[in-house]
Design a protein with these regions (language model features):
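Glycine-rich anion/phosphate-binding loops
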Residues: 27-42, 66-81, 115
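Short, well-ordered coil/turn segments that N-cap beta-strands
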Residues: 8-12, 48-51, 86-92, 125-134, ...
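Hydrophobic pocket-lining residues that define ligand/cofactor binding sites across diverse proteins
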Residues: 45, 82-85, 124, 164
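Active-site capping/gating regions of soluble enzymes
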Residues: 104-181
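Conserved, mostly hydrophobic/aromatic
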Residues: 55, 94, 136
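Alpha/beta catalytic barrel-like cores
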Residues: 1-48, 61, 149, 153, ...
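Active-site acidic/histidine proton-transfer and metal-coordination neighborhood
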Residues: 70-93, 101, 107-111
């Protein structure tokens, strides 16, 4: 399949995390797993034609969440993943996603998303990631799906752009979003 994709002019890639699991000592939160054996899997994926990969860290917004433990654990995993992907000659898609589940306000989403993205970049820098060789795939700034205080599309755009300008280094060449928000 990768060769067929390449023949059309598209670039094949693959999701390499193995999913979000309960975070020890914070069971309401998740940490993404899949680092064990990743270097070897990446070699195989590259040989098969993959040129980019994706890893998703998920965060919830509640009264005391996301916790520092969840923020740090997922940011560290995203950085380790990115280092291995760049080492293998591929482009990492770094996806720190603050979920829209819940009753939180757009302002809470802005604050938590900024914190999550900034911590991710702190870890990416510590791990010596070439920021010009990644794609960031964050969430948009939205009120929770159960919030009574929704914001307009214009406010979503404005708050998302403000968050990204505040949190993302200029070296990052691309930012992608889910089509559903």
């Amino acid at each position: 399949i990768p060769s067929i994709i390449s023949e059309t002019g598209a670039v094949p890639g693959i999701k390499v995390d193995t999913g979000a699991k309960d975070l020890a000592n914070s069971p309401d939160e998740k940490v993404t797993e899949g680092l064990d054996g990743l270097r070897e899997r990446l070699k195989k994926y590259y040989e098969l034609g993959a040129r980019f990969t994706k890893w998703r860290g998920v965060y919830i917004i509640r009264e005391k969440y996301p916790s520092k433990l969840a923020i740090n654990s997922n940011a560290h995993a995203l950085a380790r993943y990115s280092a291995l992907v760049q080492e293998s000659g591929m482009v990492p898609i770094v996806e720190p996603e603050v979920l829209m589940d819940g009753e939180h306000s757009a302002e809470d989403c802005f604050i938590k998303t900024s914190e999550v993205i900034q911590k991710c970049f702190d870890e990416l820098i510590i791990h010596k990631i070439d920021l010009s060789g990644i794609i960031l795939k964050p969430n948009m700034i939205l009120a929770g799906n159960k919030s009574k205080n929704k914001i307009s599309n214009e406010e979503v755009s404005s708050k998302t752009l403000q968050c990204l300008k505040k949190s993302v280094p200029n070296e990052v060449p691309g930012i992608a979003f889910l089509s559903g928000g």
